[in-house]
């Protein structure tokens, strides 16, 4: 039986997710419906991607009995309300990052998923890339000894994009792209809570963070330094430094195709497509989609790789960092 997907929102990320699904076997994954707040946009998206049903409201999608799981690709500030509505209608949900605007909302969604006994996962697609799988394996094997220091950065000049700078749209470097650095460290340190969070940065004229650096300190004298900006391109690398070596992602840390371990590089190709894509290595979203299918087939209500506890920890760290910078969302 195919996993039947409903797509919530017709933005750029939803386009790439649907294209990524098309690289997987049709016997396993089918997109059966799409919803936008504008019916014409939904119809247009459905026509482009050969989706049978188009809805002019998210509520209709949430109530569609043919859907197994809903992918939420809408803007950040509506995540909480849309995901809650889907959960209340008994739908499994894969929601784009950030899962919600703050940790209180994340806890609310986790509680709702448990109450209604449905699957919920934050769509940090990075975690399902072969590079990330390789990193988890290397860490479990203590390939670089004890991890003492992590560096991660994600910067890209998107300061002209309203979604990235407007406070009402949930803009800002940390919520939009810096969150990938936070999830990376959270993965490496197995969801452990940092002993301290120190953030410094600069605010955009709109009041969101345009540049932010965070120092996380963990027990056992372990440290992570994360940097993110929407004002300039960064090398977008990561480094995990241990007592016996170093693991590096040389570029595209959020959707990587290569990893360097003690100077030796290994490459992994993402699925191929001829369809137009908006995001680098976007077909790699197929990895998270297949993971969701496997979780559902096993009857799981959360992912063992991108757990709800991790989502809560990521949101908690970001809350603390944004508070220190004085970023307040409506």
Curated annotation (Swiss-Prot):
Gene3D superfamilies: Dihydrodipicolinate Reductase, domain 2, NAD(P)-binding Rossmann-like Domain. The record marks 180 as: May play an important role in catalytic activity. The record marks 176 as: May play an important role for the adaptation of the alcohol substrate into the binding site. InterPro entries: Gfo/Idh/MocA-like_OxRdtase_N, Gfo/Idh/MocA_domain, GFO_IDH_MocA-like_dom, NAD(P)-bd_dom_sf. Belongs to the Gfo/Idh/MocA family. Homodimer. It catalyses: (1R,2R)-1,2-dihydrobenzene-1,2-diol + NADP(+) = catechol + NADPH + H(+); D-xylose + NADP(+) = D-xylono-1,5-lactone + NADPH + H(+). This is Trans-1,2-dihydrobenzene-1,2-diol dehydrogenase. GO terms for biological process: D-xylose catabolic process. Its EC number is 1.3.1.20, 1.1.1.179. GO terms for molecular function: D-xylose 1-dehydrogenase (NADP+) activity; nucleotide binding; trans-1,2-dihydrobenzene-1,2-diol dehydrogenase activity. Keywords: NADP, Oxidoreductase. It comes from Xenopus laevis (African clawed frog). It is an enzyme of class 1 (oxidoreductase). It comes from the Eukaryota. The record marks 71, 79, 97 as: May play an important role in coenzyme binding.
């Amino acid at each position: 039986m195919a996993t039947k997907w409903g797509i919530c929102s017709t933005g750029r990320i939803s386009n790439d997710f649907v294209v990524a699904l098309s690289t997987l076997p049709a016997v396993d994954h089918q997109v059966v419906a799409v919803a936008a707040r504008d019916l014409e946009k939904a119809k247009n998206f459905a026509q482009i991607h050969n989706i049978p049903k188009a809805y002019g409201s998210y509520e209709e999608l949430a109530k569609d009995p043919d859907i197994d799981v809903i992918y939420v690709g809408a803007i950040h500030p509506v995540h909480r309300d849309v995901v809650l509505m889907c959960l209340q209608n008994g739908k499994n949900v894969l929601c784009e990052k950030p899962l919600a605007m703050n940790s209180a909302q994340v806890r609310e969604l986790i509680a709702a998923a448990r109450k209604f006994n449905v699957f919920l996962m934050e769509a940090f697609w990075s975690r399902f890339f072969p590079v990330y799988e390789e990193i988890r394996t290397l860490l479990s094997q203590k390939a670089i000894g004890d991890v003492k220091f992590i560096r991660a950065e994600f910067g890209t000049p998107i300061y002209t994009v309203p979604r990235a700078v407007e406070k009402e749209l949930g803009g800002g470097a940390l919520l939009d792209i810096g969150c990938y650095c936070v999830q990376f460290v959270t993965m490496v340190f197995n969801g452990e809570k940092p002993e301290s969070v120190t953030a410094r940065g600069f605010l955009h004229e709109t009041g969101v963070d345009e540049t932010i650096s965070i120092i996380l300190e963990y027990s056992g004298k372990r440290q992570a330094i994360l940097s993110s900006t929407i004002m300039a391109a960064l090398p977008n690398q990561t480094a995990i430094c241990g007592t016996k070596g170093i693991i590096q992602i040389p570029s595209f840390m959020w959707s990587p195709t290569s990893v360097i371990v003690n100077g030796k590089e290994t490459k992994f190709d993402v699925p191929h497509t001829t369809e137009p894509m908006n995001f680098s290595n976007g077909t790699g979203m197929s990895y998270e989609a297949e993971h969701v299918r496997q979780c559902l087939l096993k009857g799981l209500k959360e992912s063992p790789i991108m757990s709800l506890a991790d989502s809560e920890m990521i949101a908690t760290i970001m809350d603390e960092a944004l508070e220190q910078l004085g970023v307040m969302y409506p």
